[in-house]
């Protein structure tokens, strides 16, 4: 398993002590634009979010949005867990004081969920906010039904 951790520190064990018991090597990189491209081929990306939560949120959204890297797991202090929202794009989070067993289980689960194929619905066409259901003859934009005649739908 290839794990990358974005952190200003050079040792992952200083951020998350449980990493020293993992059988996978963790590559620590600074959170600078020149290192973001390496996250694309990582199985899991750990993001040190113990300090600057605003910057961590922006980086998490970048990695899971335009960068389209593997699943991102935030490393937080206990107080930071209250701030994290779904719009950050993180797959999971772990507290800095997590045990090796908890960290290992979370990494396995996050990786497994990321590898699960999404079901393909061949009767639905999605382009941005527009969703067309060819079997129900409906079209929606941002969730609102568009009133189309049969000819317009075709």
Description of each model-found segment:
Residues 7, 48, 95, 148:
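Small/polar loops that bind or transfer phosphate-bearing groups
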Residues 1-4:
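Extreme N-terminal starter segment of soluble prokaryotic enzymes
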Residues 64, 68-126:
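Basic, amphipathic DNA-recognition helix from helix-turn-helix-like DNA-binding domains
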Residues 112-151:
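Short, Lys/Arg-enriched segments at the junction into DNA-binding effector domains
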Residues 22-28, 43, 89-95:
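Active-site regions of enzymes building and remodeling cell-envelope glycoconjugates
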Residues 8-14, 23, 30-72, 76-83:
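Conserved phosphotransfer microenvironments
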